[in-house]
Amino acid sequence: GKDNLLDLCIEKFGKVALFHRLDRDTSGLCLLTRPGEINAYLDKLFKQRRVVKEYLALVSSQKEIDAEGVIKTRLRPHPRRRDQMVVVGKGGFYAESRYEVLGESEGKKLIRIWPITGRSHQLRVQMSYLGVPIIGDRIYGGGEKTGLRLMLHAHKIELPAADGFETRSFSAPLGEDFKQLIPTSLINLLP
């Protein structure tokens, strides 16, 4: 059987293009298209960094961080672990994200994150770098003993109007397993 979304879509629809993919353990919205004019439009928007991607993350409150901010780092693959990225002072690939802490309770913070760039593992590495690893992240320090999946969710994508296409916004609801981990006092803060 097929074990990933791309294979399932190809089987059902034929040729598709993948414009917004997720790390294996991240839940939420993917953006796939069938061949056509939309692909040139999306390609242009992504290259110009005009697509607004919004994620929700539940992180460990190990450290105090600003209520909102911008994280700018340089990332490169780990020299020995190919499945891992590391922050470096020089070289690597520029990675930038904006974040907002929606609330904090019971040792957890609910954070909304907007990646500006789209590097592999970017949000996971950057949250860990800030000292607030994403819960369930076995690679970057938030899930060694929890047994939980990664609490990172691609919540929303906004595509601006351009080249004859209208503004579009897509969202994916949080899964029940994610919602159950959010402290009751923070549930009403969800966007």
Descriptions of predicted regions:
Residues S60-Q62, I113-I116:
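A structural micro-motif recognizing beta-strand termini
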Residues S120, R124-P191:
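Pseudouridine synthases involved in rRNA/tRNA modification
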